[in-house]
């Protein structure tokens, strides 16, 4: 995820300059995009002591920001956005050296948050800005999905699978209602079109009731349009 974010930063720095925003002005920027989310230190542990670690889950992100150009080099913004988060888990295949076991596949946590990013934007050129701030997020949904199959091996490379079982449901009670993050990002503006990338560095444990210690790690890439007021 960090490599993707750094590549995006590099591409944006290659673009040319546009008109500098005027200080003392307001604007509204609705935006839509995609999220690349993961949960730190999260994993599924099987009965045969194998581990499926979390990996990136791709989802939707969209919302709107209200911006105030404080000076030629500094702008402030507040916004509301909906972001899909959570994580996928790596499939656990059959172990042909074992007499029996369970395979896990298509496992994921699907989380939804309403984010309230509060940001300062520092212009490093006429059209390119770096941003940093704070962000509370409010959990709106949390579901889990796992598919599993028991199996037996014959010791000769053959394997017999039982029926595929699907386990899914609402797990919102596992998670805290509020999460906090530090968003850092970069934005490029061309003819009022805004291209933005943000990395949300989660500060708080998303789980409640001592279920684990995982934090959100989310990259959002979005395109928006700047309406000057």
Model-derived features with residue positions:
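Bacterial Sec-dependent N-terminal signal peptides
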Residues: 1-31, 223-229
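Short glycine/proline- and aromatic-enriched beta-strand/turn motifs that initiate or cap beta-hairpins
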Residues: 20-67
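Outer-membrane beta-barrel channels and translocator barrels
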Residues: 21-23, 69-71, 125, 191-193, ...
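Hydrophobic core residues within well-ordered beta-strands of beta-rich domains
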Residues: 26, 60, 74, 114, ...
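Residues on the lipid-exposed face of transmembrane beta-strands in outer-membrane beta-barrel proteins
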Residues: 30-34, 60-68, 80-82, 116-124, ...
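Extracellular/periplasm-exposed beta-strand and loop segments of Gram-negative cell-envelope proteins
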Residues: 38-57, 84-112, 139-179, 183, ...
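N-terminal non-globular leader segments, chiefly Sec-dependent signal peptides
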Residues: 60, 72, 97, 102, ...
């Amino acid at each position: 995820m960090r490599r993707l974010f750094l590549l995006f930063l590099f591409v944006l720095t290659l673009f040319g300059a546009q008109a500098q925003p005027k200080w003392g002005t307001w604007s509204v920027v609705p935006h839509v995009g995609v999220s690349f989310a993961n949960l730190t230190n999260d994993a599924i542990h099987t009965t045969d002591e194998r581990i499926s670690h979390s990996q990136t889950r791709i989802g939707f992100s969209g919302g709107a920001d209200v911006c105030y150009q404080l000076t030629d080099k500094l702008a402030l913004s507040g916004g509301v956005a909906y972001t899909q988060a959570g994580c996928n888990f790596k499939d656990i295949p059959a172990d042909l050296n074992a007499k029996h076991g369970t395979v896990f596949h298509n496992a994921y946590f699907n989380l939804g948050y309403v984010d309230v990013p509060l940001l300062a934007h520092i212009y490093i050129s006429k059209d390119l800005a770096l941003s940093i701030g704070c962000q509370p997020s409010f959990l709106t949904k949390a579901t889990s999905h796992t598919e599993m199959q028991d199996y037996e091996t014959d010791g000769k490379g053959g394997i017999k699978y039982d029926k595929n079982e699907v386990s899914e449901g609402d797990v919102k009670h596992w998670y805290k209602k509020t999460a906090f993050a530090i968003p850092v990002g970069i934005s490029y503006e061309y003819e009022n079109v805004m291209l933005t990338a943000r990395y949300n560095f989660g500060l708080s444990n998303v789980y409640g009731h001592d279920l684990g210690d995982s934090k959100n790690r989310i990259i959002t890439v979005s395109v928006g349009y700047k309406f000057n007021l």
